[in-house]
Design a protein with these regions (language model features):
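A short, hydrophobic C-terminal helix/tail in secreted or cell-surface proteins
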Residues: 260-272
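Generic N-terminal leader/processing signal
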Residues: 1-2, 133, 230, 266-269
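Short, charged beta->alpha transition segments
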Residues: 8-11, 47
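Bacterial carbohydrate/catabolite-sensing allosteric modules
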Residues: 15-257, 275
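Conserved small/polar residues in nucleotide/adenosyl-binding loops
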Residues: 1-5, 257-263
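Central regulatory/effector-binding core of bacterial HTH transcription factors
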Residues: 4-9, 29
């Protein structure tokens, strides 16, 4: 098995040497090797929909930074697909998706920086709102008031970025989930022990292992029944599967009193099929 991002720039033929190979989360539209992908787009969409269901109206995305929707149409990366799913959920709900709600952060350290930037934006929006309120109460006011509302929800492209974001927000006195709600992606075990515990999109790693094993077994059996040629020259088309996920609401989006005793399964996996 091969995690594509960790072998970027290395020809796959130099890795497999004619042996069965399964790529993990390669995200290619037309794969040349058997591939098992994470539920990147659907999972991100579900995460943002959860924030919306929790009452969020201005949702920030922490990941690779802003990309126009036209550029997301044919992305072939997990981060790009997650951004496509998240932005699609925002636009479908009539909520803003623009540069002002996108922040760069892919790990804990950059997540802290993103948390600081979001906190500063929130405090600025609060100050503007206070100024507008004071002005609207002044005698003789005729000018329309009302600035950009403060960010009240954050979707992070992975859990470790979310850990950093929560820390960065805390540095500015921003409370989660009281002031802003945060959700991550992947289902890192540490999210069960943080304060607050982290809401996340839990990917089915057991299913990933099973799909990958089934693909390798199929290739080996096909080769043994044939003339011993490499898998790719044997003419059997590459297959692609997407594992399932579970939306796990925890304290970072839902107050402890309202946490569901069991996570909600928001989708089923897509079984292996020819690309």
């Amino acid at each position: 098995m091969c995690i594509r991002d960790r072998n970027a720039g290395v020809p796959l033929s130099a890795i497999n040497h004619g042996r069965p190979l399964v790529l993990i989360d390669a995200c290619e539209e037309t794969p040349t090797f058997d591939t098992v992908n994470f539920p990147n787009e659907d999972g991100a969409r579900a995460a943002v929909q959860h924030l919306i269901e929790c009452g969020c109206h201005r949702i920030a995305i922490v990941g690779d930074g802003y990309s126009p929707r036209t550029e997301l149409a044919h992305v072939e990366s997990s981060s790009g697909l997650r951004l496509r799913g998240a932005s699609g959920a925002l636009l479908d709900a009539g909520l803003p998706y623009d540069e002002s709600t996108n922040f760069i952060g892919y790990g804990s350290d950059s997540g802290i920086e993103a948390g600081h930037a979001i906190a500063e934006a929130m405090l600025e929006a609060r100050a503007q709102s206070a100024d507008d309120t004071a002005e609207s109460r002044s005698p003789g006011t005729t000018r329309a008031t009302g600035g950009t509302p403060a960010i009240d929800g954050i979707f992070c492209i992975n859990d470790y970025a979310a850990f950093g974001v929560i820390r960065g927000l805390a540095d500015y006195g921003i409370r989660v989930p009281d002031d802003v709600k945060v959700i991550g992606f992947d289902g890192a075990t540490a999210g069960s022990y943080t304060t607050p515990t982290l809401s996340t999109v839990q990917v089915d790693l057991d299913q990933l292992a099973q799909f990958a094993l089934d693909m390798i077994t199929r290739r080996v059996e096909q080769r043994d029944q044939g003339d011993g040629r490499s898998d790719e020259s044997a003419g059997m088309p590459a297959t692609r599967a997407t594992i399932g996920y579970t939306l796990v609401p925890r304290e970072s989006t839902v107050f402890r009193l309202y946490i569901s005793p069991s996570p909600r399964d928001r989708t089923s996996a897509r079984m292996p099929s020819s690309a």
